[in-house]
């Protein structure tokens, strides 16, 4: 479960930076030239919101490789690497997607999938996962990650993040305009947004961005149930995924950046912000599902 640090932090950072650049370019003066132009602001918020989410999505794979120290398996160096590649290949063919890049990285038990497009994704597993699980359990985890790719979860989460970003940008500027107008209510010579507007919007972009992450995390948890069921379907039976979840429940999962946590296999953060449901809920959902 690896994602309450990178996609979110990258996304918030991109939105804040774009907001500052827009201020420096005078966009805010245009929006407030004759009072707050709500129509123009909504269009601006839409561009900013989805722009931040799309940039984060496009950056997801290179950031994952760099931040996790992933080694791409182009030519397997041992039996484990050859088995991982062939397992990903078999599941990809069964799921109807092109073969993702396959990687391995040093770390405690975990795995993740990422990438902007389902036919050019990355699936990576940790050395700790290979050492701490049976092959059948690792196979189930790989199936879970391939299911994420086949379900288009990265794009889905980016679209949800884009909607939330739009609300964040819109609300922060409406509130910023109100605060700035109040602070300068006795200044008849003022024109355009002041320092109160800029400070308020930057602070609210960050604060509201983290509140929006709670909603994004809820959607992410629902995608995890689907990926668990997808792994069971790819393997033709659900017990290996259930066994893998039980095993992970007794392990200490490896830490991952936030942008990867929603596409990982387990997590270790507060429930509201957690991108993954509790292990016991996932096991119960899988046991009660119609998969395999």
Swiss-Prot record:
Active-site residues annotated for this sequence: 145
Gene Ontology molecular functions: metalloendopeptidase activity; zinc ion binding
Cofactor binding note from Swiss-Prot or TrEMBL: Binds 1 zinc ion per subunit.
EC nos: 3.4.24.-
Organism placement in taxonomy: Bacteria, Pseudomonadati, Pseudomonadota, Betaproteobacteria, Burkholderiales
Root EC class: hydrolase
Example of a GO biological process term: proteolysis
Family: Belongs to the peptidase M48B family.
Binding site residues for Zn(2+): 144, 148, 224
Cofactor section: Zn(2+)
Residues passing through the membrane, by range: 4-24, 38-58, 152-172, 199-219
Swiss-Prot/TrEMBL keywords: Cell inner membrane, Cell membrane, Hydrolase, Membrane, Metal-binding, Metalloprotease, Protease, Transmembrane, Transmembrane helix, Zinc
GO-annotated cellular components: plasma membrane
Protein name: Protease HtpX homolog
Keyword Ribonucleoprotein carried by entry: no
InterPro entries: HtpX_protease, Pept_M48_protease_HtpX, Peptidase_M48
Membrane topology: Multi-pass membrane protein
Compartments in which it is found: Cell inner membrane
Protein source organism: Acidovorax ebreus (strain TPSY) (Diaphorobacter sp. (strain TPSY))
Record keyword Secreted present: no
